Amino acid sequence: MKVGIALNILTKPGHSDVSVFAEHMALGDLAEPLGFDSLFALEHHFTGYAMSPAPLQLLSYYAGRTKRIALGTAVIVLPWHDPIRVAEEIALLDVISGGRCLFGFGRGAASVEYAGFSIPMEEARPRFAEAAQIIVKALTHEVFDWDGVFFHIPRMSIRPRPISHPERRFYASSVSPESAEIMAKLGFGVLVIMQNEWPMAAADIQRYRDIALSVGHTPRPPIILTNISVAESRAEAQERAMQYLSRKWDSIDDHYHFSDGHLATVPGYEFYGKMTKTYTKMRDDSFRQKATEFYVKLQIVCTPDECLQQLAELQRLTGMNHLVTEFAYGGMPHEESELNMRLFAEQVMPVLQRDPAFASPVLVTPGEAASTAAEGVFAPA
């Protein structure tokens, strides 16, 4: 199994953006020396939720500082961008990195970001689908053109040409069942953020596989992104997770405003309206403890030995062959984030990477996993 780290650069009260960014960049610099296989950058705008407005630019920095590690986006939100510009930047990063990039795409769910870019949210899904098709065509054809609903592109060529067929390493973030269907039909792999009970996430992944096969695509194993809290004792790992994942949850709702229910009436985002009840409960002090415990239970929170057991079960359910981790979240002090990362790298990651038991997952049958629930669903990373 491959193991990566994602940089989710959340602001901290009382700390400058520069200092917070420096802390996360330091974790990024540790990824290759500690033996991680990949480093992922997010895209978000206009709030302190994740200060990473240009993931390809950030990864270009690491392309020059690393030799081996794969570089991934989690994700580029296509409806906010000109697809030609995205294709050019992908091709350039592919060249300067020596073809060691993974490109994740998504459609976003934060109204503040859509408003900031003057893009109607109800156009998100068709914009995503059209932009994705353009990017694939631009990178697989020497010369191409396009006449669509949102984009009209004259005959042109992308230069420099990519060196390693990056379209074969395209993934897309899947939260709703509808998104999984879109990704499967496009032939993309799927990047799943663990925000639902594991059997339910497994059922959505199986649905993606079934759709991909039905339209002639070979489904790839999913990339799974999750938060990690590992410590020598379960109590210490749990205490850290409860404190900082609770704060992360607050930052999610501050950015997405799921608790106000506004997405329930936006075409293409009805699924997110189901999150309203869950997020509203987090604003209720009488329910907050229980809700936080449920969110923490979805993540990997344990001792090193228990981590291996939990990840074996997660792999069995999902068929993942690439785990992407977050060690710094919710304003966690840098020293504690680094300790979290180092302990995982020393005692958990080598087994994941080298033990044959983690090389070829044995998947559950579709009937063993439940369909996506209407409640108990969380937000993107």
Language model feature labels by segment:
Residues 32, 59-67, 90-100, 181-185, ...:
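Acidic (Asp/Glu)-rich catalytic clusters
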